[in-house]
């Protein structure tokens, strides 16, 4: 388990270091969704397997901090209360990076669990859409998406 934690943190540290605007945050998001939808990915093992409680807590705390640092680093305008990213996307300046990082981790964990059960990435994408809404790093979940199967398949977008 320690190996999966270390691998995820190494990848996240490298990838999140390059996130400087909403477009790059959306790219990070797509990559993480792809990792979580790949059954034997280290991300899947790190989030879904039980392990030593202190080890898991340390892993999640370190990942949360990487995400929070990234969110805090995104451009701000300060004066208007909105942030304008270089891609033309906006975010509110009053968004708490620490709370948002916790929300993103909760979306990754819960969304990936629901997506695994449904065999459909829609629940994970929906959870991340809401968590990342202040940064406009969302995906199009329009009518072209696949119909969900399984017990949560009756949910509609």
Locate each region found by the language model.
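Short, basic, alpha-helical segments at the C-terminal edge of helix-turn-helix-like DNA-binding modules
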Residues: 2-9
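Short amphipathic alpha-helical interaction patches enriched in hydrophobic/aromatic residues
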Residues: 9-16, 51, 112-116
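Amphipathic alpha-helical packing segments from all-alpha helical-bundle domains
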Residues: 10, 53-87, 98-102, 122, ...
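Hydrophobic alpha-helical connector segments
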Residues: 13-41, 101-104
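Amphipathic C-terminal alpha-helical segment
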Residues: 35-38, 90, 104-122, 134-143
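Amphipathic alpha-helical segments used for helix-helix packing
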Residues: 36-61
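Short, hydrophobic secondary-structure boundary micro-motifs
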Residues: 42-47, 94, 116, 143-144
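Intrinsically disordered, low-complexity terminal tails and inter-domain linkers enriched
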Residues: 76-94, 140-156
């Amino acid at each position: 388990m320690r190996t999966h934690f270390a691998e995820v943190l190494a990848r996240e540290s490298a990838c999140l270091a390059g996130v400087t605007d909403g477009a790059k945050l959306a790219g990070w998001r797509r990559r993480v969704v792809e990792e979580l939808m790949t059954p034997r990915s280290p991300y899947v093992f790190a989030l879904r397997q039980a392990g030593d409680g202190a080890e898991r807590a340390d892993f999640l705390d370190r990942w949360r901090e990487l995400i929070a640092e990234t969110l805090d680093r995104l451009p701000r305008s300060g004066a208007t209360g909105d942030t304008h990213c270089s891609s033309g996307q906006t975010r509110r300046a009053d968004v708490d990076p620490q709370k948002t990082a916790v929300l993103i981790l909760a979306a990754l964990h819960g969304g990936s669990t629901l997506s695994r059960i449904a065999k459909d990435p829609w629940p994970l994408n929906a959870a991340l859409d809401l968590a990342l809404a202040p940064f406009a790093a969302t995906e199009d979940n329009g009518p072209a998406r696949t119909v969900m199967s399984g017990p949560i398949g009756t949910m509609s977008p």
